[in-house]
């Protein structure tokens, strides 16, 4: 029995040797050449895979950029006609002496009648006659954005609005004086707090529009 096992083992070894010799002879490929071919093939495959991944990443970046570029302005993103309309005459104001008589350093500089600080943002602070638009009223003002009534003014009576801008230059370049229809999104209760204004400006569903209005300070 031992002799039979040795005989089978020898036959197997001879078969494998003959097969390997035949393969190398027919193909003309030496073992070292075969190893080199396998390595080169793997490197080529990995290179192609890397190029495909890079192309996919570039395509994804281009798609994201295109989506951002296609973001509609706030005016076109919603059906504002669903809300009550009010005809107003709107002007612009700043926190400075030219509008409020106050200068930086004054404890009341930049503070509105409601106590919140003036802000140009997704929801900006605006001044109105509280008998027409109570403090806290949210308005959509075409070409200006969303405004929250947080301030009043001695000259702001009736259907008048004063829209906050950072500088006098912004007032003249971006607004001036306009008569237009505004949309009453929500009637105010007579008050507004910093926390409430901040929450409005952090509304997740509207962040895509925020950079259209937010003033970026260095």
Swiss-Prot record:
Record GO biological process: peptidoglycan turnover
Residues spanning the signal sequence: 1-31
CDD domains referenced in this protein's UniProt entry, alphabetically: DPBB_YuiC-like (cd22786)
A Pfam cross-reference name: 3D
Annotated protein name in UniProt: Uncharacterized protein YuiC
SUPFAM superfamilies documented for this protein: Barwin-like endoglucanases (SSF50685)
Source domain of life: Bacteria
GO cellular component annotations of the record: outer membrane
């Amino acid at each position: 029995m031992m002799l039979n096992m040795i005989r089978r083992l020898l036959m197997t070894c001879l078969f494998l040797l003959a097969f390997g010799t035949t393969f190398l002879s027919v193909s003309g490929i030496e073992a070292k050449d075969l190893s080199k071919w396998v390595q080169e093939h793997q490197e080529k495959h990995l290179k192609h895979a890397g190029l495909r991944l890079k192309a996919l990443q570039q395509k994804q970046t281009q798609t994201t950029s295109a989506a951002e570029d296609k973001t509609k302005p706030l005016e076109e993103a919603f059906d504002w006609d669903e809300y009550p309309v009010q005809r107003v005459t709107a002007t612009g104001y700043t926190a400075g002496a030219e509008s409020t008589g106050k200068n930086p350093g004054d404890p009341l500089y930049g503070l509105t009648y409601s106590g919140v600080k003036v802000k140009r943002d997704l929801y900006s602070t605006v001044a109105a006659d509280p008998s027409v638009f109570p403090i806290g009223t949210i308005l959509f003002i075409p070409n200006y954005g969303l405004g929250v009534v947080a301030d009043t003014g001695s000259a702001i009576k009736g259907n008048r609005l004063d829209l906050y801008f950072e500088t006098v230059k912004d007032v003249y370049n971006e607004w001036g004086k306009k008569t237009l229809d505004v949309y009453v999104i929500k009637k105010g209760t007579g008050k507004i707090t910093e926390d409430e204004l901040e929450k409005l400006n952090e509304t997740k569903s509207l962040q895509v529009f925020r950079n259209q209005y937010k003033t970026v300070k260095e």
